[in-house]
Design a protein with these regions (language model features):
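Electrostatic cytochrome c docking/interface patches
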Residues: 2-21, 50, 88-89
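Axial heme c-ligation environment in periplasmic c-type cytochrome domains
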Residues: 37-46, 59-89
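Gly/Gly-Pro-rich "capping" loops immediately C-terminal to redox-active cysteine motifs
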Residues: 15-19, 23, 31-62
């Protein structure tokens, strides 16, 4: 079994990259710096155990959420997740 772990520096770098990707692609609906202003869900409320749900929603979309699977690379999606988790509270 292979287990990958993130060092603190790598996670911070990923979260920083994720912040940029988020602001370019997600902030219109989910709010700048994860502060929602409309009907879109508050992503800060996504708990760590909801990563599979997050991935499915980003890749496949649902309702008002468009599918980003062919637009955002897996690494970019992971960076967005790191950013969301770094801001969760």
């Amino acid at each position: 079994m292979l287990t990958l772990t993130w060092s603190g520096a790598a996670l911070a770098q990923s979260a920083s990259a994720g912040a940029e990707i988020y602001e370019e692609n997600c902030a219109t609906c989910h709010g700048e710096r994860l502060r929602p202003t409309g009907a879109a869900p508050d992503l800060k409320k996504l708990t760590a155990d909801r990563k599979d749900f997050f991935e499915k929603m980003v890749n496949d979309g649902k309702g008002q959420m468009p599918a980003w699977g062919g637009v955002i690379a897996d690494e970019q999606r992971e960076a967005i997740w790191a950013y969301i988790r770094s801001r969760a509270g």
